[in-house]
Amino acid sequence: MEIGVDIVDLDRIEKAYNRYGVKFLQRFLSEEEITLCLQKPQVIASIAGRFAAKEAVVKALGTGFSSGVHWKSFAILNDKQGRPFVQPADAGCFPACGAIKISIAHDRHAAIATALIEWV
């Protein structure tokens, strides 16, 4: 079992989004993630939360964004109850992983995410 944590300053995300718009989001989010974020009442917090969650997942993997894992190798989506989950882009993305659990929280200044990976 491994854990990863990341925290993101909302101001940093807001400045980049205001400067580059959707092009900024397309660098690290899938189209489905972008649509979800833009529908949320707190757009910047939603973007920052997904950014932090992706960072937390690769930290838990122990690889960072390398070894074939890229920003768009997986998406951070929400189930019907609103809980975030990891959706791999393809079945081979996390071959040795059992369950990947994530939690995302944010306040006025930052978003934080935790990822827990259970290995097979």
UniProtKB/Swiss-Prot annotation:
Under Enzyme Commission nomenclature, its number is 2.7.8.7
The cellular component terms of Gene Ontology attached to this UniProt record, alphabetical and capped at eight, are: cytoplasm
Compartment(s) of residence: Cytoplasm
**For binding Mg(2+), which residues are annotated in this chain's numbering?**
D6, E55
Q: Which InterPro entries match?
A: 4-PPantetheinyl_Trfase_dom, 4-PPantetheinyl_Trfase_dom_sf, ACPS, Ppantetheine-prot_Trfase_dom
Q: Which reaction does it catalyse?
A: apo-[ACP] + CoA = holo-[ACP] + adenosine 3',5'-bisphosphate + H(+)
Q: Which residues form the signal peptide?
A: none
Question: Quick check: keyword Nucleotidyltransferase in the entry?
Answer: no
Q: Which GO terms describe its biological process?
A: fatty acid biosynthetic process
GO molecular function terms here?
holo-[acyl-carrier-protein] synthase activity; magnesium ion binding
Q: What domain of life is recorded for the organism?
A: Bacteria
So which cofactors does this thing need? Answer: Mg(2+)
Note one Pfam family from the annotation.
ACPS
Main EC class the enzyme belongs to: transferase
* SUPFAM superfamilies found in the cross-reference section: 4'-phosphopantetheinyl transferase
What are the protein's UniProt keywords? Cytoplasm, Fatty acid biosynthesis, Fatty acid metabolism, Lipid biosynthesis, Lipid metabolism, Magnesium, Metal-binding, Transferase
| Function of the molecule | Transfers the 4'-phosphopantetheine moiety from coenzyme A to a Ser of acyl-carrier-protein.
The family annotation for this protein states:
Belongs to the P-Pant transferase superfamily. AcpS family.
Q: What is this protein called?
A: Holo-[acyl-carrier-protein] synthase
Organism the protein comes from: Pelodictyon phaeoclathratiforme (strain DSM 5477 / BU-1)
